[in-house]
Amino acid sequence: MEKLTKKGLDGTQLKTIALVLMVLDHIHYFFEFTGCIPTVFSMLGRLSAPLFLFCTVEGFAHTHDRRRYFIRIWAIGAAMAALEFFMIYAKAFRRGDGFYPQNAIFQDLVLLCIVWQGIDWLREKKFAKGIGAIAAVLCWPYVVVVFLLLFPGVQEMPIASTIVAFVITSPLPMWTTITDGGWSFLLGGVLLYALRGHRRVQLTAWAVLIFLCDFALPFGMACRQAGFVWTQMFTDYYEWFGVAAVLLMLLYNGQRGSGHKRL
């Protein structure tokens, strides 16, 4: 353990760990209905998204071509969201029992990349560009709402309403409607980037946020339910297990690593 701590884990190793955990999580997600997949697969999978988020923060900060980096994430996110759109509205590619996956984590990363760039512009005292980038992400859902209020007839037109739904699902996602990650993931991403360079403060703040959002808040709500027992936080409401990813983040040695360039 001392040797591992001294050397640390590079970016490639962290991504590989995250990928393995993601595979376990997806096996449970897709095949839980068989009753043959242990819940521990999903529990371990809670660490995957935080690790990928951390690696994306580092990747965005160090890449030599942010535009290309962003476009690649956007393209993957848009493609995955487009597939999800057809599953929802056209009921295509669904499982026999009607199940369809809701995997849109790349849409979260698309929005975060814009906010991260805005943060850097603010640091460079390019206030107009920085505020504009962040405001674009925050205000986009409200722009859509205003548009629909001004043109209510759009919602009654099948083709027009479908186009609007597709646009806000795939190419121009809204933070209020993304089905994967959620607002705690987005806030965590902002914290991780804003506090880069102060590793202990960065990871402590992130861990506290995730614990509050994914443990304290659900616990407070679940306590009001009849028959709830605290042990259910370890068997049913285990989204907060993702906070354990901070232990692996602490081992990051700042190196990109070799191989798996497309991860």
Where are these regions (language model features)?
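Alpha-helical transmembrane segments and their immediate juxtamembrane cytosolic regions
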Residues: 1-263
